[in-house]
């Protein structure tokens, strides 16, 4: 076993099925030997774009890794990595690095140093025996908290170095933790939902990544609240549903603007409320904003937030649905907003 075999075995243990890649990387052959399918691309960015699309299509529920050659290969992937970072895509990127003896020699490119600001977590591994621990840390970052790309740079000479077969036994697959928001905060959110005369829900990509589409639908139906999806959240709420107003993109249905303008409560669920020229701007004055997010850095980032909850969307919305059923009955309230 060598370093490439060790990393490939870890990827398989974590459920990685495809490895979009640009040669040369010894990880490509190591992965193919154990049925982790390499997808060879013609330009480095394409590897990350393939993984990006795959992860969005599966709602972030599948694991996916990418690899490219060190130096120019790693540099060429930067634009696609920045896109994944901007859109919170939970991708594991394993760029090659210069040999350990050449680290820190100018102008050799270091992904670990240069990708710090376009990734959620960015490190390098320098010894074969550290691979299990660094990969475990990488997957823990990948699976928990706010989604985003995780980068682990692997010097190319580590791929061919001998690795003790017992190292794989040190690896512990990482699970996703789904903390629920505080119970009293959930009750206060339900109070606000029921007290509002014209509430609107803004549902984001966090609903998809949490697998909380069913809970969102139940909440909207019980409280009879119309739902607008963000661009990245498109698909989290069925657009043929009577309570769907459509997507709040730059091009949007008239109902999106009409309901936002008359809303007295705007509730963001699984969204960062990020301002963008591609997203419908939300009115600020004369309304209350509530937000459910799994990362405190999203709160009041671009909009004034009156009430925030921190937690995973699925258990938090499930608890809100349970409380609504207790207050309103399983049929919910009559009429709609």
Which sequence ranges carry the predicted segments?
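N-terminal alpha/beta PP-like core and its mobile active-site loop of ThDP/TPP-dependent enzymes
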Residues: 1-332
């Amino acid at each position: 076993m060598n370093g490439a075999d060790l990393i490939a075995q870890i990827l398989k243990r974590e459920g990685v099925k495809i490895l979009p890649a640009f040669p040369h990387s010894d990880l490509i052959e190591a992965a193919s030997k154990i049925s982790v399918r390499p997808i060879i691309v013609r330009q480095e960015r394409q590897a990350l774009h393939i993984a990006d699309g795959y992860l969005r299509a599966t709602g972030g529920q599948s694991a996916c890794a990418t690899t490219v050659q060190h130096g120019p290969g790693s540099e060429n992937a930067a634009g696609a990595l920045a896109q994944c970072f901007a859109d919170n895509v939970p991708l594991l990127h394993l760029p090659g690095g210069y040999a350990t003896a050449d680290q820190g020699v100018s102008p050799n490119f270091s992904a670990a140093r240069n990708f710090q600001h376009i990734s959620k977590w960015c490190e390098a591994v320098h010894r074969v025996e550290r691979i299990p621990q660094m990969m475990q840390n990488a997957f823990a970052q990948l699976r928990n908290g706010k989604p985003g790309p995780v980068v682990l740079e692997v010097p190319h000479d580590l791929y061919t170095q001998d690795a003790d077969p017992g190292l794989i036994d040190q690896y512990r697959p990482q699970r996703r933790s789904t903390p629920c928001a505080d119970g009293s905060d959930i009750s206060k959110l339900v109070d606000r939902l029921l007290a509002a005369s014209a509430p609107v829900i803004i549902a984001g990509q966090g609903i998809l990544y949490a697998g909380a589409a069913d809970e969102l639908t139940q909440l909207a139906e019980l409280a009879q609240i119309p739902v607008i999806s963000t661009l990245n959240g498109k698909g989290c709420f069925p657009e043929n549903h009577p309570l769907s107003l459509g997507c709040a993109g730059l091009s949007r249905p008239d109902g999106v603007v009409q309901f936002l303008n008359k809303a007295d409560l705007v509730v963001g669920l699984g969204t960062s409320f990020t301002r963008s020229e591609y997203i419908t701007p939300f009115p600020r004055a004369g309304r209350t904003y509530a937000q459910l997010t799994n990362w405190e850095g999203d709160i009041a980032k671009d909009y004034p937030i009156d009430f925030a909850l921190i937690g995973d969307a699925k258990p938090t919305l499930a608890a809100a649905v349970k409380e609504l059923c207790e207050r309103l009955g399983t049929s919910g309230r009559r009429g709609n907003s």
